Swiss-Prot record:
This is Dihydroxy-acid dehydratase. Functions in the biosynthesis of branched-chain amino acids. Catalyzes the dehydration of (2R,3R)-2,3-dihydroxy-3-methylpentanoate (2,3-dihydroxy-3-methylvalerate) into 2-oxo-3-methylpentanoate (2-oxo-3-methylvalerate) and of (2R)-2,3-dihydroxy-3-methylbutanoate (2,3-dihydroxyisovalerate) into 2-oxo-3-methylbutanoate (2-oxoisovalerate), the penultimate precursor to L-isoleucine and L-valine, respectively. The active site is at 518 (proton acceptor). Disulfide bonds: none annotated. It comes from Xanthobacter autotrophicus (strain ATCC BAA-1158 / Py2). Binds 1 [2Fe-2S] cluster per subunit. This cluster acts as a Lewis acid cofactor. HAMAP family: IlvD. Homodimer. Its EC number is 4.2.1.9. The gene is ilvD. [2Fe-2S] cluster binds at residues 122, 195. It is an enzyme of class 4 (lyase).
Length: 617
């Protein structure tokens, strides 16, 4: 029978000093036999997805205490990728994932916490906490801050839903007036919560449901809706129950590595492919699997991408569908339900809230449940009032979207496409693979051949795209030395993809990079090219004007030069000595913190995880 970890610091005569300190935090005599639950919050006023979390940690803490536990809250850092985008601030985004994971480990292990509730929301916070949960393998429940309501603008054609990507595209479009840009800017992000489309934050919060580590509704219930409070209340009670089951009943099935097994990772990736989730989820699932010693790899993602259809399309893949619409159609449990009926997921797996995923679907899939309370839950609607306050409205739709032929969520027979929403491509410039969000690629350019336009920084590419005539239809914008080591930090290329759209080139050009893309990116945007240029990848050998061939249906990407020519170029590169595999003219200040990250990080094909074996003494 496992012992409560907290007893290391709460029991025994020699722990009198530690108990004295615990007492100074408010603990009483009767508390020292209770499970100590870490409430891992991520409140910050920098990030709209986190501005409303300040009081939610204490909400969970009070519920933990009601259930018989002792709650102790702390915060992690949280970077807003949208605010950090387009400048050197983005160098810090992906590295912050590792810092978040480490900070959770440090706090939980230093204080011997028995279990934890992870209150996350935005892009790197959920992955960082997920990595920590898999690393620590103590009972854990995830509850996110929830998506923001979609912005709305009134046009001559009627009301249109918008988000920050629309504002960015409008701002770079010379045909849009300053006044209209102002309207878009003021309307794009109306409430607290993670950005309203199927961007990275919402994708990851949806995947925690598929992994079995979060309550149903976690990925789709709006941050502003009163229904979301129930998730926080239930999480507080659930985590105490899970802790007791593990420490008092020796039930290891509740642990993260038991719940988030290989099959659960397959479920999560299947969901991601079916809903056209962010390509960043590939990085994060690989990293979380690595922490939990789950043998889930790019090869598994490639295998799944060839058999899973697209059942749901959300902004940025389509213009007018956002997370609030997915929720009305039954949320993530409805998508999982359709995947189950198609024989595409495993349902014999445990979750933190149900004995099996099959049991969870019986209760929460709106197409099979008879529960009126579940139907009411998924009718939660946006309030339409700008606010930074959680649970501030309780509006409901009159009905659910149960149309599986033409609705927001489709059944397998009426899929948007039989080919999945993400694909892994391989070829002579991506021997270890690269990722494309096929759900956001127009059918006319699934096969594309063009001339390489070489840039060794995102900034240089942006300057060229915005300069009239420098980038033409048919070009392949190739941005390199922006990978995990080369950046360092693997910047998101949201501005280049958005500006290509602004210039009317969104369906006429491709963008290929060893960096990554925002969940808000769409178009023929191919990222995570591995090995990256800074690691000696062949993307570093492509020359201006080379022909790049992209064939998504056949999963191929290559530069149309012979192996002999590539070998000659490689020899010439290696002959440069210390200057080899480095950008020629880029001037970028790289801090010691980022240098340390670059020294230890690995390829995007491995999730850009840290590898301490790189250390040389």
């Amino acid at each position: 029978m496992p012992q409560y970890r907290s007893r290391t610091s709460t029991h025994g005569r020699n722990m009198a000093g530690a108990r004295g300190l615990w007492r100074a935090t408010g603990m009483k005599d009767g508390d020292f036999g209770k499970p100590i639950i870490a409430v891992v919050n991520s409140f910050t006023q920098f990030v709209p997805g986190h501005v409303h979390l300040k009081d939610l940690g204490q909400l969970v803490a009070r519920e933990i205490e009601k259930a018989g536990g002792v709650a102790k809250e702390f915060n992690t850092i949280a970077v807003d990728d949208g605010i950090a985008m387009g400048h050197d601030g983005m160098l810090y985004s992906l590295p912050s994932r590792e810092i978040i994971a480490d900070s959770v480990e440090y706090m939980v292990n230093a204080h011997c916490a028995d279990a934890m509730v992870c209150i996350s929301n935005c892009d790197k916070i959920t992955p960082g906490m997920l990595m920590a949960a898999m690393r620590l393998n103590i009972p854990a429940v995830f509850v996110s801050g929830g998506p923001m309501e979609a912005g709305k603008v009134l046009l001559s054609t009627g009301e249109k839903k918008v988000d920050l990507i629309d504002a960015m595209i409008a701002a770079a479009d010379d045909k849009v007036t300053d006044a209209d840009v102002q309207v878009m800017e003021r309307s794009a992000c109306p409430t607290c919560g993670s950005c309203s489309g199927m961007f990275t934050a919402n994708s990851m919060n949806c995947l925690t449901e598929a992994l079995g580590l979060a309550l149903p509704g976690n990925g789709s219930t709006l941050a502003t809706h009163a229904d979301r409070e129930r998730l926080f209340v239930e999480a507080g009670h659930l985590i105490v129950d899970l802790a007791r089951r593990y420490y008092e009943q020796d039930d290891a099935s509740v642990l993260p590595r038991s719940v988030a097994s290989f099959k659960a990772f397959e479920n999560a990736m299947t969901l991601d492919i079916s809903m056209g989730g962010s390509t960043n989820t590939v990085l994060h699932l690989l990293a979380a699997a690595n922490e939990g010693e789950v043998p889930f790899t790019m090869a598994d993602i490639d295998r799944l991408s060839r058999r899973v259809p697209v059942l749901c399309k959300v902004a940025p893949a389509v213009a007018n569908i956002h997370m609030e619409d997915v929720h009305r159609a039954g949320g993530i449990m409805a998508i999982l339900g359709e995947l189950d009926r198609g024989g595409l997921i495993h349902t014999d797996l445990p979750t933190v809230h149900a004995a099996t995923m099959a049991d969870a679907l019986d209760r929460w899939d709106v197409k099979r449940t008879k529960s009126e309370s579940v139907a009411t839950f998924f009718r939660a609607a946006p309030g339409g009032v700008p606010t930074q306050v959680a649970f501030s409205q309780s509006r409901r739709w009159d009905d659910l979207d149960l149309d599986r032929e033409t609705g927001v969520i489709r059944d397998v027979a009426h899929a948007y496409s039989k080919d999945g929403g993400l694909a892994v491509l391989y070829g002579n410039i991506a021997l270890d693979g690269c990722i494309v969000k096929t759900a956001g690629v127009d059918a006319s350019i699934l096969k594309f051949t063009g001339k390489a336009r070489i840039f060794e920084s995102q900034d240089a590419a942006v300057e060229a795209i915005l300069s009239t005539g420098r980038i033409q239809a048919g070009d392949v914008v190739l941005i390199r030395y922006e990978g995990p080591r080369g950046g360092p930090g693997m910047q998101e290329m949201l501005y280049p993809t958005s500006y290509l759209k602004s210039k009317g080139l969104g369906k006429a050009c491709a963008l290929v990079t060893d960096g990554r893309f925002s969940g808000g990116s769409s178009g023929l945007s191919i990222g995570h090219v591995s090995p990256e240029a800074a690691e000696g990848g062949a993307i570093g050998l492509v020359e201006e004007g080379d022909t790049i061939e992209i064939d998504i249906p056949n999963r191929i990407i290559r530069v149309a030069v012979s192996d002999e020519v590539l070998s000659q170029r490689r020899a010439a590169m290696e002959a440069k000595g210390d200057a080899a595999w480095k950008p020629a003219d880029r001037k970028r200040v790289v801090s010691q913190a980022l240098q340390a990250y670059a020294a230890l990080t690995t390829s995007a094909a491995r999730g850009a995880v840290r590898d301490v074996s790189r250390l040389r003494r």
